[in-house]
Amino acid sequence: MATVQLSRSIRIRKTSKKTVFPSQITNEHESLIMVKKLFATSISCITYLRGLFPESSYGERHLDDLSLKILREDKKCPGSLHIIKWIQGCFDALEKRYLRMAVLTLYTNPKEPEKVTEIYQFKFKYTKEGATMDFDSSNTSFKSGTNSEDIKKASVLLIRKLYMLMQNLGPLPNDVILTMTLHYYNAVTPNDYQPPGFKEGVSSHLLLFEGEPVNLQVGMVSTGFHSMKVKVTTEATRVSDLESSLFQESGTTEIAHQGLDCDEEEEECNTEIQKMNFVCSQQSSERSRKKRKVSEPVKVFIPDRK
């Protein structure tokens, strides 16, 4: 399966008819469409270049000179239907402005889903009546008047970097299992809300990582109405040949709740991932014990990769 993964690559086309993203973003509805497509394209990129589904599970779309593979419903491959259902569940939460973060997690032991081998984080923010939006990882502010061309450039850059990263990562274990957890803005999300295809999940304060983890910042896109930030955590041995300066965070590898990004409106996170087989656990303060709403899929997905 590793051969399949490494043989897949991004192709260059001079012309295209079926484009990925809208040419203009002038209102919140167009912005929502853009973010949905960017999220679905990113998930498709990950599953395709990591060799999780056969070629028949993907259609082809274009982004500038890039020929992209987009996941589609493939009745011959039930696994693709699972992932599409997860994506549609995320769409529902995005439409309602509840979704704070979607986390695609890969692990190998069905009895120990907290022991992960690779994590893909998609963090979302929403403007409030056109207010300025600030990103955690830079001092740049984005307003609702963000130029459509700038949005397109940022989107192309994010997808290019994601493709570059996926093509340079070492192969996954054959027995990998996929799941996706959804995290919410608790202040606005009803306690009984669950997107289609998801159920109430367990909010754990412990994350184990197989091997030595490394955090890779892929990129961010803001439309002025929504923003999406992408981050990957994988084993350091899988990125040995990668130009790490393009992706890696500087300094100590810090992670927040369940090893994920911390949002400024959430409680403080003082969690660290340590090298070699462990761990992150939060301080046992009253604030860090606050229950967070988490959703998990009704059913996890086990690819047939052997």
UniProtKB/Swiss-Prot annotation:
Pfam families: HORMA. Phosphorylated in a SPO11-dependent manner. Keywords: Chromosome, Meiosis, Nucleus, Phosphoprotein. GO terms for biological process: meiotic cell cycle; meiotic sister chromatid cohesion. SUPFAM superfamilies: The spindle assembly checkpoint protein mad2. Disulfide bonds: none annotated. It is found in: Nucleus; Chromosome. Interacts with HORMAD1. This is HORMA domain-containing protein 2.
